[in-house]
C-alpha cells in the first residue's frame, strides 16, 4: 500500500506540498484515481482525486480505519542526542517502525551534542511512519535540559550504567499498564547528580541487559522490549 501524508480542510483532503510531486509526476496519479493517506493523527483514509496539478492534489475522502497500525501502548523515550546525527536518525527510524509515541531530546551534563534541529528527524519519522503502515506520527520535541524534563516528572525509568541497585526494565513493564517513560543518557552516561535527582523524583533506575550499550542501541532496546511484549 502506498501511503501519502495529507490534511483535511472544508470536508476535502489535500496532500501536503512535499507529497504532490511524487503523487503526480512519479506515480502519475490523476483525476479519478484513488489513493490512501494519513493525516498523522491515527486514522487511515481513502481519497478520490478530483483535482490534480503540480501545485495541488485534492478531492473527497472516506475513513477506512480509525486507529491504523497503532499499538495499545504509550511510550516516551527521553534521550540525549548522539554526537553523530546518523546514529540518532537511525534510532528514530527504527523506533517509529516498532511503535513509539514521543521522543524528547534532553541535554545532559555529559552530552556531546548540544544543538539539535528536529526538522530532519521529523522527515525521517514521517517516512518510517508511511513505510511501516501507521496512522499516527511520533511527536519529536525540541531539545530541553535535563532539569526542564525532570521537574515535570514523578514516575518513569532511568537507564544508566552506574553501579547500584537497578531493576530489570523488562520485568518492571511486564504487568504495567498506562504510559511508560524511559530516560536514556549520552555516551558518557548520566552524571551522579542527575541519577540522584531522578531517583528523588520517583524515577526508577533500570538496566536493559548485561551489555553496555551505545545511546541509540539502548534506546532501541527499550522500544523493542515494549514492542515484543505486545506481539
Show where each model-derived region lies.
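A C-terminal functional module that forms or caps the active site or interfaces directly
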Residues: 180-197
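RNA substrate-binding interface of SAM-dependent RNA methyltransferases
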Residues: 68-157
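Structured adenosyl-cofactor binding patch, chiefly the S-adenosyl-L-methionine
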Residues: 192-231
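Short amphipathic alpha-helix with an adjacent loop that forms part of the alpha/beta core around
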Residues: 149-152, 169-175
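N-terminal positively charged helical leader segments and presequences
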Residues: 1-67, 119
Amino acid at each position: 500500500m502506498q501511503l501519502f501524508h495529507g490534511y483535511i480542510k472544508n470536508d476535502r483532503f489535500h496532500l501536503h506540498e512535499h507529497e504532490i510531486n511524487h503523487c503526480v509526476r512519479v506515480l502519475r496519479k490523476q483525476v479519478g484515481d484513488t489513493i490512501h493517506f494519513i493525516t498523522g493523527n491515527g486514522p487511515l483514509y481513502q481519497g478520490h482525486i478530483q483535482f490534480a496539478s503540480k501545485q495541488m492534489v485534492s478531492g473527497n475522502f472516506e475513513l477506512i480505519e480509525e486507529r491504523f497500525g497503532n499499538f495499545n501502548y504509550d511510550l516516551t523515550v527521553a534521550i540525549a542526542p548522539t554526537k553523530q546525527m546518523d546514529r540518532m536518525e537511525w534510532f528514530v527510524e527504527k523506533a517509529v517502525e516498532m511503535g513509539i509515541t514521543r521522543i524528547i531530546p534532553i541535554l545532559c551534563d555529559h552530552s556531546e551534542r548540544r544543538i539539535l534541529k528536529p526538522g530532519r528527524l521529523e522527515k525521517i519519522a514521517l517516512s518510517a511512519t508511511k513505510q511501516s503502515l501507521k496512522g499516527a506520527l511520533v511527536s519529536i520535541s525540541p531539545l530541553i535540559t535535563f532539569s526542564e524534563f525532570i521537574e515535570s516528572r514523578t514516575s518513569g525509568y532511568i537507564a544508566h550504567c552506574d553501579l547500584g541497585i537497578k531493576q530489570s526494565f523488562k520485568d518492571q513493564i511486564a504487568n504495567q499498564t498506562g504510559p511508560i517513560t524511559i530516560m536514556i543518557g549520552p555516551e558518557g552516561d548520566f552524571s551522579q547528580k542527575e541519577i540522584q535527582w531522578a531517583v528523588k523524583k520517583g524515577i526508577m533506575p533500570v538496566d536493559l541487559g548485561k551489555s553496555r550499550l551505545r545511546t541509540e542501541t539502548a534506546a532501541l532496546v527499550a522500544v523493542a522490549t515494549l514492542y515484543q511484549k505486545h506481539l
